[in-house]
Amino acid sequence: MNMFSSLMLASLSVLTLPIMSSILNTHKNSTYPHHVKNIISYAFITSLIPTMMFIHSGQETIISNWHWMTIQTLKLSLSFKLDYFSMIFVPVALFVTWSIMEFSLWYMHSDPYITRFFKYLLTFLITMMILVTANNLFQLFIGWEGVGIMSFLLIGWWYGRTDANTAALQAILYNRIGDIGFIMAMAWFLFNTNTWDLQQIFMLDPNLTNLPLLGLLLAATGKSAQFGLHPWLPSAMEGPTPVSALLHSSTMVVAGVFLLIRFHPLMENNKTIQSLTLCLGAITTLFTAICALTQNDIKKIIAFSTSSQLGLMIVTIGINQPYLAFLHICTHAFFKAMLFMCSGSIIHSLNDEQDIRKTGGLFNAMPFTTTSLIIGSLALTGMPFLTGFYSKDLIIETANTSYTNAWALLMTLIATSLTAVYSTRIIFFALLGQPRFLPLTTINENNPFLINSIKRLLIGSIFAGFFISNNIYPTTIPEMTMPIYMKLTALTVTILGFTLALELSLITHNLKLEHPTNMFKFSNLLGYYPTIMHRLPPLANLSMSQKSASLLLDSIWLENILPKSISQFQMKTSILISTQKGQIKLYFLSFLITLTLSMLLFNLHE
């Protein structure tokens, strides 16, 4: 094992130290959260060395040390894949987690179970690292389920609240639907290729049937909150803000996209799956952007923007650009985590007020938080030379020069424009104008944990895109020539979005709508999707179950067997008897018919 892989394993295994220490030393320790935060910072610094070595040499490594078990001809072993995707993602995830852990020291300082909270976050990080570095489906599935169960525990952290419990249950149920697809794909690979190792699967048959790939797409739909299985992500905002910043913006929700990137060698020549992926991503990115326009909860707006960006990543995979989707995963993590932390800072300072209509004028009261929020929003919209620009602008350019589904690409452009609209709406409502919160609210953002954590991500939101895109060579040949109007498309639609948002804000200030329009209702009620899916099927199920339980037993078994069947039998026999008229000619006729039929049959038989 060379130095490169040793250092990478050291940076990952150091994360398990706080878990081990908590098992050995069970009594409460007030310094434990600080200990966890420091360990993650050390892991991040250590992971930078192998990443730099990888960027310099470009040498991928597979570590396969521990053989676990053999089932007939299937060999299961612990295998780590240190390639382009895992080597770049690990430092990004560790950096973001380090900042969020420090933010949690401020945000959760009054929580009596802060030690357990940090343990949960650390366990989540370990399972995420298992998922990213896995070289076989079995190991990947362990990480996949691990992040799912940690998401459930962390969303329902404040278990005294009904909403938190409902949201946690909703998240796990929607993810279960996705997991069915994952398990189906695993079973297919086991029966047809007799292996779960990624290299062997890719080598054996690149032209698979659509079934396992559809299973993987369903798994990605569940985990990455794509249209159809998307309602759990906005509901997950019931959890604490650090959970939203870490799990539901930058790391866990991109696991579905990461899965599709991992299996891209099987998808790149499959037109059906590519088209399905593209259309699914386009519908998601537009639908969730529309839903974000009229929400009033600051965290829900950012959650819908996350879902919209995930849709954009899926679109990028759909136009056969997995490396570009991965670049967007890495750049998106910085500013989206920072946006959540800024919203958490505002919520905490305003005594847990999340409604943007009850904020306002915070630019003077919270200069650092609001500046970071504005820069994060600009990075999200793809402002030139901020982090988001380096991936988002490339995605729009590649989409414009792609010859695939034009409708899907048009929907993506509209969604990009709407990104600017809801980002500007947050800035207008929360930061500008007159203060609309209680005058006795004491606002204080002068805490080193808060300032340092946001500051690090702020630097990342400005410079990370430049560094990542400069140090990583392009893997596909870029377009050599492009008309100037196509080059400026992304910037144009963003500016259009800003203009539209300014116009809307002026209308909102000067005009009161007595009756909301149908479009407003559609957006505000999330496209009626939760109303339909969470009300009608359960109602039909419950009423059918009640009827089958209460009526089936009584009506069929008890009534039909004895009382009803006896009466039916008596009625039929009485009808039969009463129709007999007692005339001899009728009896003779019946004899004659029988005789004729028997003679005919006898003749035919001969």
From Swiss-Prot:
> What is any Pfam family matched here?
Proton_antipo_N
Q: Which reaction does it catalyse?
A: a ubiquinone + NADH + 5 H(+)(in) = a ubiquinol + NAD(+) + 4 H(+)(out)
- The answer to whether keyword Electron transport applies is yes
| UniProt KW keywords | Electron transport, Membrane, Mitochondrion, Mitochondrion inner membrane, NAD, Respiratory chain, Translocase, Transmembrane, Transmembrane helix, Transport, Ubiquinone
| Tagged with keyword Ligase | no
Q: Which GO terms describe its molecular function?
A: NADH dehydrogenase (ubiquinone) activity
Any one of the GO CC terms: mitochondrial inner membrane
What is the recorded name of this protein? NADH-ubiquinone oxidoreductase chain 5
Name the species this protein comes from.
Equus asinus (Donkey)
